[in-house]
Amino acid sequence: MTRSYLPLNSLRAFEAAARHLSFTHAAIELNVTHSAISQHVKTLEQHLNCQLFVRVSRGLMLTTEGENLLPVLNDSFDRIAGMLDRFANHRAQEKLKIGVVGTFATGVLFSQLEDFRRGYPHIDLQLSTHNNRVDPAAEGLDYTIRYGGGAWHGTEAEFLCHAPLAPLCTPDIAASLHSPADILRFTLLRSYRRDEWTAWMQAAGEHPPSPTHRVMVFDSSVTMLEAAQAGVGIAIAPVDMFTHLLASERIVQPFATQIELGSYWLTRLQSRAETPAMREFSRWLVEKMKK
């Protein structure tokens, strides 16, 4: 038999049906109908001029010819699949450099990285964290994930998620807070953005802290929450990025009032042309954030 006459679809149908001893299970595996499997097997039997299955009370049984053919097909299809996997795994690696603000990295991205690497093994993802003040051109970054209003000079920005801010503190401190005004009895922990506590206190219907109030300033919300867990003071932070701490009850949100001064964005310089790897990462991350 010459290669030009190999009935490949019929051979696939027979191999699946023979492994399962079931036309129904073969149809499910190959995503075709039961009748399609039956017709392919019939075509192969006519082509070979022999019977490959016999029906018995329990279902199907292979004939001697079927038993001889099955291991040959198993081996052939396994070798083909193995070679295709080798091609896929040796696809040229595409480097992708991402700078991500630390809070988003720990709150969202790190837990999803294994999923990305399984789905895109050809992309060499190189991550660096920053405190939201970053120079993408100087650092050679393809994308940066930043917190803010979405408008940075010379930059395209794609929305990822909202970032509501609220006070977070230890359960012991929270137990002593009877109204938002009581927060001012403690050291206030904040980022380098000066307006966070003022905006939150006003949203809660209270006077803002005085210019001389005890304040500790952090360049990382992750570090700030470490201080809050140690009882140093009360932090104002993006609550959705610290759900793991809230779930553990090491940190609590003492009041429901939240404010929003910015969101998280996936950004790239307008001068940076998108590569296939960049587009794949962007689609993957945006879809993840919709779930």
UniProtKB/Swiss-Prot annotation:
Report domain HTH lysR-type positions: 6-63
Q: Name one GO molecular function term.
A: sequence-specific DNA binding
Compartments (UniProt record): Cytoplasm
Query: Do you know which InterPro entries this protein is assigned to?
Result: LysR_subst-bd (IPR005119), Tscrpt_reg_HTH_LysR (IPR000847), WH-like_DNA-bd_sf (IPR036388), WH_DNA-bd_sf (IPR036390)
Please state the protein's primary subcellular location.
cytoplasm
Please, which domain of life does this record's source organism belong to?
Bacteria
Q: What keywords does the record list, in alphabetical order?
A: Activator, Cytoplasm, DNA-binding, Transcription, Transcription regulation
Q: Does the UniProt entry include the keyword Ligase?
A: no
GO CC, alphabetical: cytoplasm
Q: Which Pfam families match?
A: HTH_1, LysR_substrate
Q: Return the annotated DNA-binding positions.
A: 23-42
Biological process annotations from GO: DNA-templated transcription
Similarity comment: family membership: Belongs to the LysR transcriptional regulatory family.
State its role. Answer: This protein is a positive regulator of gene expression of cephalosporinase (AmpC).
Instruction: Please identify the protein, giving its name as recorded.
Output: HTH-type transcriptional activator AmpR
Q: Which species expresses this protein natively?
A: Enterobacter cloacae
